[in-house]
Amino acid sequence: MNVLRDTAKPAREHFDDVEAAQVTEGLAESAFAMRQDWDGKPWNPPAREQPGVYAWGEAHLQYAYSLQFEATGNRRYLDVLVSRFRQLLALRDDRSGRLDEVRGRVMPAWGSVRFSTRPPFEGKSTCWAVHAGMILYPAARFVRMVQADPAICRRYAGPVAEFRQAIMETLAAYEENWHENVPQSGGDTEGYYTEPMAGPDPLPLNQMNTLGRVMLELAVADGDIQYRKRVENLARFTKRRMHVNGRNALEWDYRPGLSPPFDS
């Protein structure tokens, strides 16, 4: 169904067309379809048994609902977001006692085996930080948007408290993977995340900063100083690894290291 053919329609109306035609009550299993992965194949094991994969499907859809509310002010989009995020919370590993086989403990996050492809962790369930960040982001936006709007803050007070607590629990679970570093050249402290599956080097910038943008939303919503400092440290880490290329444009490596050169 090519709903984008009618270019006279605003983008927000295109979303409603897609929603009516394709969105179901079940969670979106990929960015391209409500069911199956991005190759059109069933997840093995099923997505509900490795819910980290919803980071690349349902998380995008819930983000779209948050954007639709910003664009229209229609509370229906928030109601749907609340309902769908609660489905994700019910699948969090600690709700079922699912073990993170890499960390050796149960995490308040969403594990998967799909991306565990390298020995010695091949086929092991683990809760990737990037998946947690992707899944939490729409809920963090929800908390920030509701608290900024006196007209709706009372209506959604319950979900705001519920989601904030859940977000904080998940963020805290990755605290052991947070590191701070003072550059050899001097300057303010920077920070980065690692992942047991990926070794001691800093995670790719896009992966670690999914957690950063979640913390940024809560810092704006609640004025949390610790989250703000964490975001600033992540931003310094990223900024110091940017360089100007031959076309006078900023450029950065996907996964830069701790020490220069950063323009490999």
Indicate residue ranges for each PLM-predicted region.
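Well-ordered alpha-helical scaffold segments within catalytic/enzyme domains
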Residues: 1-17, 59-75, 134-156, 210-225
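Low-complexity, Ser/Thr/Pro/Gly-enriched N-terminal "stalk/linker" regions
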Residues: 1-122, 165-192, 237, 241-256
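Aromatic- and histidine-enriched alpha-helix N-cap/loop-to-helix transition segments
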Residues: 49-64, 76, 83, 126-138, ...
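Conserved aromatic-histidine-acidic binding/catalytic patches
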Residues: 49-53, 69, 73-76, 123-127, ...
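Substrate-binding cleft of extracellular glycoside hydrolase catalytic domains
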Residues: 98-132, 142-159
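Eukaryote-skewed repeat-based solenoidal scaffolds used as protein-protein interaction platforms
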Residues: 139-251, 258, 262
